[in-house]
């Protein structure tokens, strides 16, 4: 049986602290290396607009700041504690006007 894995924010906090405008840092935590059925990670974003094509369903949890997802010309806004489900095969855009941290 595989044991639980702990991920510490302190291990990647320096990446958020050094993020410049227009920057993003993605830290995949769950990948095919440690799971056959799921993916997930942390994404630090700062004043960005990033187009993205989803190849799998995605749940997004906004931990800090404000996050906007654009899909088919419609804006979906998240604040701290908000979540959304985004179905696969959508062409989306991650957007932030300031700093934001999401978990996907």
Identify the residue ranges that each predicted region occupies.
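Short acidic-glycine-tyrosine-enriched beta hairpin
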Residues: 73-89
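Ligand-binding loop in jelly-roll beta-barrel domains
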Residues: 88-104
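Conserved short histidine dyad/triad with adjacent acidic residue
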Residues: 36-54, 88
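A short, N-terminal "cap"/entry segment at the start of jelly-roll beta-barrel domains
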Residues: 1-42
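Conserved strand-loop elements at the edges of beta-sheets that form or border functional pockets
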Residues: 54, 61, 78-80, 96
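Short, conserved beta-strand element in jelly-roll/cupin
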Residues: 44-45, 54-71
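Short hydrophobic/aromatic-rich beta-strand segments that constitute the beta-sheet cores
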Residues: 52, 69, 102-104
């Amino acid at each position: 049986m595989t044991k639980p894995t702990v991920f510490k924010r302190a291990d990647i906090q320096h990446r958020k602290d050094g993020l410049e405008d227009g920057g993003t840092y993605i830290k995949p935590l769950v990948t095919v290396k440690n799971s056959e059925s799921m993916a997930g990670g942390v994404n630090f974003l700062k004043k960005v607009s990033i187009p993205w094509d989803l190849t799998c369903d995605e749940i997004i949890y906004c931990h800090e700041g404000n996050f906007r997802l654009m899909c088919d010309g419609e804006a979906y806004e998240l604040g701290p504690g908000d979540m959304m489900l985004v179905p696969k095969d959508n062409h989306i855009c991650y957007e932030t006007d300031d700093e934001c941290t999401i978990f996907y």
